[in-house]
Amino acid sequence: EACEELRFGGQAQVPTLVDSVYQQFLAPGAARWINIDSRTMEWTLEGLRQPHRYVLDAAQLHIYML
């Protein structure tokens, strides 16, 4: 749901939403931590440098494929 909100939300909200999703689900010690493989995490972390609405797509796909 968070990734869908990011994808279809306003462009001005993208950096805030990306950071929020990262902190909540992917950051070390996150409250609702989700384990993704190292390659997907690497791509995601690279994308966080210049966040865009599709930066979390690889992580979302990885989670769906589990």
From Swiss-Prot:
Entry keyword Mitochondrion: no
InterPro entries (alphabetical): RGS (IPR016137), RGS6/7/9/11 (IPR047016), RGS_sf (IPR036305), RGS_subdomain_2 (IPR044926)
RGS domain sequence ranges: 1-66
BP term (GO), one: negative regulation of signal transduction
Pfam families, A to Z: RGS
Domain of life: Eukaryota
Gene3D superfamilies, A to Z: Regulator of G-protein Signalling 4, domain 2 (1.10.167.10)
A Gene Ontology cellular-component term: dendrite
Record key words, sorted: Signal transduction inhibitor
GO terms, molecular function: G-protein beta-subunit binding; GTPase activator activity
Function: Inhibits signal transduction by increasing the GTPase activity of G protein alpha subunits thereby driving them into their inactive GDP-bound form.
Subunit and partners: Heterodimer with Gbeta5. Interacts with RGS7BP, leading to regulate the subcellular location of the heterodimer formed with Gbeta5.
Protein name, entry field: Regulator of G-protein signaling 11
Encoding gene per record: Rgs11
